[in-house]
Amino acid sequence: MFASRQSCAAEVERPIDPFVFARYDRCCYLYAHPVPASQVVTVISLSSSSEIKPEVSAEELRSLAPDPTDQARYLVAVRALCEFTAKAGDLDLRFTPSPTAQEGIAGHRTVAARRSPGYQTEVSLSGEYQQLKIRGRADGYDPALNQLEEIKTYRGELSAMPDNHRQLHWAQVKVYGWLLCQQLQLDEVNLALVYFNIVSEQETLIRERFSALTLQTFFQQHCAIFLQWAEQELMHAGERNQQLSQLKFPHTSFRTGQRHLAESVYKAVSTGRCLMAQAPTGIGKTIGTLFPMLKAAPTQKLDKVFFLTAKTPGRKLALDALTVIRTSAPELKLRVLELVARDKACEHPDKACNGDSCPLAKGFYDRLPAARSAALTAPWLDQAGMREVALAHEVCPYYLSQEIARWADVVIADYNYYFDLSGLLFGLSQFNQWRVAVLVDEAHNMVERARQMYSASLDQQNLNALRQTAPEALQKTLQRLNREWNALHKEQLAPYQAYPETPGKFLLALNLCVSAMGDYFNDHPQALNGGLQSFYFEVIAFVRIAELFDEHFVFDISKRALSSKRSYSRLCLRNVVPARFIRPRLTAARSSVLFSATLSPRHYYADLLGLPADTAWIDVESPFSREQLDVQIISRISTRFTHRQASLAPIVELLAEQFQARPGNYLAFFSSFDYQQQVADLMQQSHPHIPLWQQARGMSESERQGFLDRFTLESQGIGFAVLGGAFGEGIDLPGARLIGAFIATLGLAQLNPVNEQLKQRMAVLFGAGYDYTYLFPGVQKVVQAAGRVIRGQQDRGVVMLIDDRFAEPKVRQLLPRWWQL
């Protein structure tokens, strides 16, 4: 089914005609396949949450694998069928302490061990309805009692379980009941829901007798609902595939280098490879990666394409590129979805996510079918489009978008939707066994973003504040945690210290705290408040990361004194090498393409991101000539911290001389806000006639846009910004909107104990502590900032690299080859 992963490192470098593509005999999409049903079976397996449910075993997933001899056109899991057709009522995200996967498995075994000797577990059942084949495994069947059981494990009070959850459980056991009646030719059967409390180990059994005819009617009703949807999806996928196979490049010609990029992406997905593509800013990377991936989708049987970005502007560029494609092919039936953060999509941030609090959660699942259908008939679902559909049907835009992610063809989202430990898109892909392609935009950001995803921290000051207001039932647990916390840093004299291992006694106290808080929330759901709940989630995250701790993490304690006798500390589990977590997510996709203007040196990214050994690398030729960009190294000025005061006047005069020689719009980048302010103050004193505007700390999106709006075709002035911030990458100011950049820093990270510890670890792991911690990330930011200047074939501009270290050979060799220094 999959194309072989043969080596193609050399092949990817060699240009091919992107419109003369190798053909593959079979083409299969989830929900659709344009080949006879006898050749391939489509697996439909939907989950209503972002996580793989512990109740679905690996054995069950294997049982749902396509059977080449099966004549059914659709294969669906029992649970997936019921989640699609039987969910009703409110969206309710109130705290419910669920058992872990291990606890759930243990609970099932305990229940089974209590049954009679003839009791059967994991009973495989299957049946058909028209073109559907339904499969699953019932938890248990007792032939002596003629009783089929569905076992559900839980914590806390069973009465707290929402009614719509139990309704879904009954739907599952009824479908299993009909499949059993059909398989054993039974006229009736006892169906039982067995709720097992994993703490008390008590069972609550809810039993009802059903006739086979009643169960058959129920089964057929739900299958008919699902089949209608599945046939609609088949029609959509067939039309989409045909249109994508005929898709033409939306412009009259490729830019220089853009064709090489597109060909390489196509070959990477055709051979099931990971591709790292370094391509200069302005080449058209977004459309140069999206187009070939869409073109390859039919032959490579891709279910979805994920376009992942680090920042909001990246999502906009992807939407713009898809708009160009859609405009050039107006008949193209392509469902495009933009996923945004919950706080940006929430219509009622002051309300809780449940039907008693939020009107858009009330009856969410009752209105979901109509909202889902409406969303998919208006296939352009950016944030505004999704909001419009959701509000028209009175459902939550954020959770509707998560549902539509199951049916979209292209999903544009932040990195964390795929790479985070609980990422929605990765979880859905694994559960549904989707065949996906992943495009990672501005991939130079992946190292730092991934480190953040797989790190966790706790602040003792938050614990202290919590102890002042926590309920009596939690005081003893919190006091014990605080004692263990104090013991951790009691002997630490330095403000910062790293440790080789995680603290065992502290983690034990932390786990007891998790258990106690979970039990309290379950007994007192009305007691949930921002501080208590936030601390609970922070603790859970810390415990989870602690379980992953190895040599690729650093555990450190940062102390701060409140008085001569009292101090607080902050504990941090810092991931420094995310390769262990990134690599499985890259290899799980049919193809992962990471692209950026700055992916050098290769070994830096290969080491830290865990790239597969057969990853293909390309360095795309710049579409711009050396004459377009005048790059000057100003080596007479040092911007080192010790020389900062002396650098102010020379930098101001340099900016003024360039502005007077060629008036226009410029960006000036500095290493910090303080440095920026010092230069700006002197600039305004010395040259008040030169307009300037500054980046401020914590700017909102509207404020950032206001900063950029100052750069017009008619304006003149200098925008001051911090290197590595919002304006150092991902912004597009073509033509006269920006004609030059001054970069008064090498971009090196701040010298502090944390970075020095990182440097030590990088030296141990890779033998290049300074380079991996300071030099490579710093120069990367410089090149990104310089890339803002030349955006088109007609642009002309200047970049001034202000620091004597830019003249060093080790630094110069990291700069783009096409620059004329």
Regions found by a protein language model. Give the residues of each.
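Conserved pre-motif I regulatory segment
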Residues: 236-278
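A contiguous, basic/glycine-rich beta-loop/short-helix subdomain that forms a polymer-engagement track
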Residues: 386-411, 422-429, 521-638, 646-647, ...
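Metal-dependent nuclease catalytic cores that hydrolyze phosphodiester bonds in DNA/RNA
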Residues: 25-30, 34-146
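Conserved RecA-like P-loop NTPase helicase motor core
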Residues: 635-646, 696-805
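A substrate-engagement module of RecA-like helicase motors
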Residues: 241-242, 248, 301-411, 416-419, ...
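Walker A/P-loop
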Residues: 271-292
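Mg2+/Mn2+-dependent nuclease catalytic core
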Residues: 125-217
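Signature of the SF2 helicase/ATPase Hel1-core->accessory helical subdomain module
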Residues: 393-410, 415-516, 597-611, 750-752
